[in-house]
């Protein structure tokens, strides 16, 4: 039912996905209009240059260094941003400088950043969760909490299979996947319990 009057403080933030391809951005800043209001707008950055870290380890001063320590340093045309806190975890994300400038110019402090790597569905189980975009594979290994999280370049089903084998090893655990049918079909040849979501 739609609320007719008053404000709705439980309104979910608006989300905008930014896919980083070949050092560029997949949206045109001119095509994005400034939304009226004061509600936050979350930008979900699709890039393999992202890592998760405990809140107490991350500050604006060391975010880029932490990203670099994981082998995912920002390129010369990028800088790091941090996500909002989620389950005591922060995502440190590399974002294109021009994209960041456009976002800040249009939305200022209303803008926040996130990553598909922060998806903690099934976090209480022993399992692997996989989300794939056009060129990135996001994997999270859980065992009653987050054990490992990786974002890797994966443009084919075989790339995703490689990363899944590397993360799961010989364990027989469920794999929950949000991806194309081709990826799920290939994974089912190697793993017993693959569930498409």
Language-model regions, residue ranges each:
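Hydrophobic/aromatic-enriched cytosolic interaction surfaces used to assemble or bind macromolecules
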Residues: 1-197
């Amino acid at each position: 039912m739609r609320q007719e009057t008053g404000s709705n403080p439980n309104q979910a933030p608006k989300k905008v996905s930014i896919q980083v391809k070949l050092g560029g951005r997949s949206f045109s800043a001119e095509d994005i209009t400034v939304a009226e209001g004061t509600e936050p707008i979350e930008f979900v950055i699709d890039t393999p240059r992202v890592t998760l870290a405990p809140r107490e380890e991350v500050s604006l001063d060391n975010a880029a260094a932490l990203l670099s320590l994981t082998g995912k340093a920002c390129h010369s045309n990028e800088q790091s941003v941090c996500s909002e806190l989620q389950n005591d975890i922060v995502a440190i994300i590399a974002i294109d400088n021009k994209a960041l400038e456009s976002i800040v110019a249009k939305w200022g402090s209303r803008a926040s950043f996130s990553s598909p790597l922060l998806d903690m569905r099934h976090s209480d189980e022993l399992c692997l969760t996989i989300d794939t975009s056009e060129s990135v594979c996001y994997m999270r290994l859980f065992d009653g909490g987050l054990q490992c999280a990786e974002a890797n370049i994966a443009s084919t089903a075989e790339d995703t299979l490689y990363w899944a084998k590397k993360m799961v090893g010989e364990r027989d655990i469920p794999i929950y996947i949000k991806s194309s049918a081709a990826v799920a079909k290939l994974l089912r040849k190697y793993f017993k319990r693959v569930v498409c979501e």
